[in-house]
Amino acid sequence: MKIIITLLAISAIVYSGCQQSRLVPQPLNFTENPVDVPNPDRGFYRPQTFVLPVESDTVPRLTNLSTTIAGTDVWVDARIVYMAFDLKNFSSNAPLNGLPLGEWSPEGARPPEYGKTQPLTPAALDYVRAALQNLRDSEAVAIVKFSYDGRGYTYNNRGGYDLPLHDCEPGAPQGRVWYETGVEEESDLCGIPGHEEKNWVQYHMWQLGHVFSEFEDVIMVVKGGLFGPWGEMHSSSYARTAEGYHWLLNALLGYVPESRSILVHAGGVMAWHNVEYGTNYSFTNLMPAPAPGTPAQRFGMRNDSYSKGGEGYTDGGSLSEGFRLIGGDYDRNAALTWIRNQNNFYGGETVRSGNEPENMYPRFPNVPYEAAYARTTHLNTSYSSAAYVNWADFIYTEENITAPFTPPHDGVTRTAIFDPVYDGKNGMEYMRDRMGFRLVLREAMASESVNQTGTLRFEGKIQNVGFGLIVNKKNVSVLLKPKSGSSHFAALTDIDARDWRPDLDSRATNTSAWRDVRFSIDMGAFGDVPPGEYDIYLKINDPKETSATKRSIRFANYDIWNADLGANRIGSVKVTS
């Protein structure tokens, strides 16, 4: 296939030229197709664990992207892999194969084996690279997490216990030695020449930072999961201090590419902000929406018990995590507002609270109502079936979805909005399709004809009917493809797809939520375009994407996606000489 690409920045809003052909309506279908539309950076994810080896003895493989969602028969073609990298082999405080001994241990039990605190070896780093290269070769992007206790062995929640045991991070003060002797570690510094000021976690982050940069194109977001069991940022000595969050988040801000965000939680971010900037934010003195491009705006939210509700309405502690570091107060509405204000990624996994018949939080209509407000972007395909079966059993009708409900955390009666596009579908199909962004072309006007030396113009409207935003910057290019032939011509615009923001009302009739998409492009930017009839396409992908068509954003319209181009047809034009 012949491809001629000229990467020139083209004004998306300023029109040039003296004699312009008139704009004419394009004969396209501007309605939404209510089906699974696979796109990067949003939707259900496939979880996968990788244990970093000390020596090269294993080859990482990637999980299948397509699956049925747990507890349902709803199919999804996922475009996110949650890559949980376990660093347990590189911490002397990380049990390798079981819980530390305690009153729960059977008679004659032996203690577990432990890792060894040391730098990440070349084999370990190459293993991460190989896993991310497998991902790059697929159609997916990654949520990347590194932790020291992926199996949660330093927290006993088995057999009726609910007890943190000891720190899992290398060098942490209350690790294995403290657990066995009561004596804390004197220092957590790594002692590596040239890095004497770094503790072991910071040093490992420094090592991994090089890998982050190499695979920036396929990393959706990095989860700040280095503290505590399961990497859930609780229970560890480090996670119990504002200073711990301060040095960790600063390290992540430094080592994660500037174009990528970091998932933590509201309490930890406000604790970091209070130390870094001398503020006094809390759930009753909420941190305001940070300015785009600032360090504070790079933080999204990971919820490990999404929509659980539960005691204190904290989602099992996920929404309130870190509240003791910022004044000891908590409010569910404030937590959700903080998430919304961050204009970033929000998601995680549900839990077994679906088995609680009186709990409205993991049920419709509360689930989509809160998801739209907090701008939910991603959830786990595998966990938990107990919650997901309720979503699949819910029939999405106007009567069902608009039934008033009153969450007990504030006693305010709410009503969700009915979108007739999904009438008769089930709740899981609605959640599958609405998570993150979902773009529908609503209007299209293009130049009827354009001279080879003229200016191609387009004016249209796009509606983001999803819950969430386009968070990561994308290139938006215009392609011209002859109606007969396989070549195409491309020009890069300066359109910012992140401006296509969602609205709480996603219905097509809400024209105030339709966002402008306009461009005016000198034909010379495409190169030497022969006269003829052309289709106009919009291609949206990551600026550092290395493939021709992978990970391009697909609109949810009928009959406009071209898989060979990885682009959406938005009209046609006649090029004249």
Give the location of each predicted region:
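An active-site-proximal structural segment forming one wall of the substrate-binding cleft
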Residues: 123-141, 164-221, 244-255
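Sec-dependent signal peptide recognition
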Residues: 1-7
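Bacterial Sec-dependent N-terminal signal peptides
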Residues: 7-8, 14-30
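Well-ordered, non-membrane alpha-helical segments in soluble/globular domains
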Residues: 107, 113-131, 195-208, 240-251, ...
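Loop/turn elements at helix/coil->beta-strand transitions in domains of secreted/extracellular proteins
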Residues: 76-80, 137-142, 215-221, 256-262, ...
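Extracellular/luminal regions of secreted and cell-surface proteins that mediate adhesion/ECM remodeling
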Residues: 425, 429-577
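Catalytic-core regions of glycoside hydrolase
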Residues: 34-52, 57, 221-400
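N-terminal substrate-binding region of glycoside hydrolase catalytic domains
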Residues: 23-129, 147, 153-188, 192, ...
